[in-house]
């Protein structure tokens, strides 16, 4: 039975670090898929774009088609290996927040778990300010909290359409990273029995 875990978190929360460390420690052999990368690969194959930045400019209908292609590909991969899908629950746009996974995509992926990585707004803001390599939006602590609240609401909507369990993992500055990694490993290890 396919085992799919969706992992989300706003920029600066530590999602990539936690994911990398958890994948090194889990007993299950997960395949990590970045949903946006898979969509981009599909768009390049179809001759729609050459660069990642062009993705945002594609018509919404085309973007939805690319999302479905990516979801179907992930569903096929999940027949062989457990899959960890790195994606955004919500995406901040200049016009408002957009759901990262539309209804049809969630139904197709049918995740077992939706994991949200969170931290306090002040911790996230501090991490963003220290990470000068990344080009990130400047947000206030209030805006960061709103984005995290919207991610929780999106996760609930996704779970309603897939029967997934929601797991919120907190990644705090004071000894939080190790605890966060261990919590994710516990979830990932549940896949071992599915592929035995």
Curated annotation (Swiss-Prot):
Instruction: Say which family it is in.
Output: Belongs to the archaeal adenylate kinase family.
Positions of disulphide bridges: none
Report the EC code(s) recorded for this entry.
2.7.4.3
Q: What keywords does the record list, in alphabetical order?
A: ATP-binding, Cytoplasm, Kinase, Nucleotide-binding, Transferase
Q: Which compartments is it annotated to reside in?
A: Cytoplasm
Q: What class of enzyme is it?
A: transferase
By its UniProt entry, which Gene3D superfamilies does this protein fall under? Answer: P-loop containing nucleotide triphosphate hydrolases
Q: Extract one GO molecular function annotation from the record.
A: ATP binding
InterPro entries per UniProt: Adenylate_kinase_AdkA (IPR023477), P-loop_NTPase (IPR027417)
Q: Does the keyword Lipoprotein apply?
A: no
What reaction is this protein's catalytic activity? AMP + ATP = 2 ADP
Q: What is this protein called?
A: Adenylate kinase
Cellular component GO terms held in the UniProt record:
cytoplasm
The answer, when asked if Iron is one of the entry's keywords, is: no
Principal cellular location given in the protein's record? cytoplasm
């Amino acid at each position: 039975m396919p085992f799919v875990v969706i992992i989300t978190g706003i920029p600066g929360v530590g999602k990539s670090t936690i994911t990398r460390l958890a994948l090194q420690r889990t007993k299950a052999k997960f395949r990590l898929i970045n949903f946006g990368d898979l969509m981009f690969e599909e768009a390049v194959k179809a001759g729609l774009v050459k660069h990642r930045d062009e993705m945002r400019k594609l018509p919404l209908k085309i973007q939805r088609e690319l999302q479905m292609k990516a979801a179907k590909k992930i569903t096929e991969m999940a027949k062989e290996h457990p899959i960890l899908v790195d994606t955004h629950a919500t995406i901040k746009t200049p016009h408002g927040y957009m759901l990262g996974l539309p209804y049809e995509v969630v139904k197709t992926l049918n995740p077992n778990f939706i994991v949200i990585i969170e931290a306090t707004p002040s911790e996230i803001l501090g991490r963003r300010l220290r990470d000068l390599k990344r080009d990130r939006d400047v947000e206030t602590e209030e805006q960061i909290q709103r984005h995290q609240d919207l991610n929780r609401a999106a996760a609930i909507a996704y779970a309603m359409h897939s029967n997934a369990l929601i797991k919120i993992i907190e990644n705090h500055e004071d000894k939080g990273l190790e605890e966060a990694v261990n919590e994710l490993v516990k979830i990932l290890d549940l896949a071992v029995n599915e592929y035995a």
